[in-house]
Amino acid sequence: GGTWEGWWEFPGGKIEHGENVFQALNRELIEELDINVNPIKIEEKVNFDYGNRKIELTIINCGIISGVQITLIEHEEMRWLSQEELLDVNWLPADRPILEKWFNRGLPNLPLD
């Protein structure tokens, strides 16, 4: 654990050299949750300054291709949340503005397939 132990975050991670955001998302979700996804579109981009480092968070709407049974590889817990439940967990500061927007305005349209 570290400074943010016990906080919630979107699954994902850093883009490696030679990857685009969609390739990075696929790799990270296989590494973290053992699922393959079909990235549909970028929903949001947020820049956040944690003081000691700056990050760009890219939220991508996607459908699950395989691995419907999610395996927690790098995380302790996972939850599906309804719009009403979005703010019920302790989100990392970079993620919170996106969740507050979805809580107030509604979730992005999810892909049907």
Label each residue range with its predicted role:
Residues 69-113:
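Nudix hydrolase/Nudix homology domain
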Residues 32-39:
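Short secondary-structure junctions
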Residues 22, 56-57, 95, 99:
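A general structural signal for well-ordered alpha-helical segments in protein cores
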Residues 2-3, 52-54, 73, 93:
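A generic fold-level signal
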Residues 36, 45-69, 77-79, 83, ...:
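Active-site-adjacent beta-strand/loop module that shapes the phosphate/pyrophosphate-binding cleft
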Residues 1, 48, 86:
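Surface-exposed, flexible loop/turn segments at secondary-structure boundaries
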Residues 1-31:
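Conserved Nudix-box catalytic region and its N-terminal flanking loop in Nudix hydrolases
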